Amino acid sequence: MLDLALLGCGGGMPIPDRFLSSLLINYRGRKILIDCGEGTQVSMKILGWGFKSIDIICITHIHGDHTVGLPGLLATIGNSGRKEPLTIIGPEGIKQVISGFRTIVPYLPYDINIIENPKESLKIRLIKNSVEVLKGHNNSFMENKSSKDFARKKEVNTDGCGDHNDILSCDIEISTLELDHSCPCIGYKFYVNRKPKFNLEKAEKNNVPKFLWSKLQKGENITYEGIKYNPNMVMGRGRRGIKLSYITDTRPINSIIKFIESSDLFICEGTYGQDEDLHKAIKNKHMTFREAAKLAARGNVSQLILTHFSPSMMEPENFKQNAVEVFQNTLIGKDRFVKTLCFRE
């Protein structure tokens, strides 16, 4: 299962009881943060979700309401005792922003790996006290302090990590989509793999030696006494994972529909609640509640949570009906709202 917390649901500027954009994902004790607006650390502290285990920070774009919390957070992560490298993913310009922030926090006890404007999906493998990130045109795992001996070449699949070999060695896949905002901006999709079950009958039918079963279940390819063995020889059929999509600060472009298709949860900006504010949404390259709901309906998602509310909209719940009329299973996001996504049977 996947736990998530909306740390901040505001856009533009914080207001009482509403911090700026931030979402935290927790999977098997490792964390991914999406955006880091003002107040991110406060919400984390209130919830009691630790800082040290944040392995990846995904930034949608470099506007201040999505990034100004970064310097303080990076310092806090360092003060929490983290030594393992941390990965920051973002659009064009993120390297320059992080470089500027490092003048504020020049001394960190961990390395920062920056992936700017990724063109391929990124595969994440959970390891002890950290993660490994698969990136680059040769699809090799990034070399860092905790993964120098791990390098694999794999094909990238849009949803999930491909065949049994990939699924067994890849826990999460992160995909990005270029959006339509006033600066380079990307949306994120997270696919959590559900590993297939061991198939005893299949293993015996393929005459796989018992002492190789555990290695094959971990995704290894093995040659023993001149015979090649692979995970497909002992594993059952693939199982559906969990898909979470996150789209904010954009107009509702058509490419979003395919990107979010069949998501278990679609978190989307709803900067403006009233239909009458459509002209503002167009001018500022944002969305209304109704526009976000139309994307959810066309993308056939299971649930929509609206976030990134204009500071002028004090009570987003008052405009919920504008979204529900289009997509019934809509929730209005609130700071520190916590939800668990479970694997389907």
Task: Give, region by region, the residue ranges found by the protein language model.
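Active-site neighborhood of divalent metal-dependent phosphoester bond hydrolases
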Residues: 82-84, 92-123, 130, 135-152
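Metal-dependent catalytic neighborhoods of phosphoester/phosphodiester hydrolases
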Residues: 70-76, 98-101, 314-322
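Active-site neighborhood of phospho(di)ester-bond hydrolases with catalytic His/Asp-centered motifs
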Residues: 34-37, 54-62, 66, 90-91, ...
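Divalent metal-dependent hydrolysis catalytic cores, especially in the metallo-beta-lactamase
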Residues: 86-89, 115, 265, 300-312
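Active-site metal-binding motif and surrounding structural segment of the metallo-beta-lactamase
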Residues: 39-89, 111-118
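Short acidic, glycine/proline-enriched helix-loop-strand junctions
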Residues: 86, 314-337
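Metal-dependent phosphodiesterase/nuclease catalytic metal-binding core
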Residues: 121-306, 317-326, 342-345
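Conserved beta-strand hairpin/beta-sheet module of binuclear metal-dependent hydrolase folds
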Residues: 1-49, 83-85, 188-190, 236-247, ...
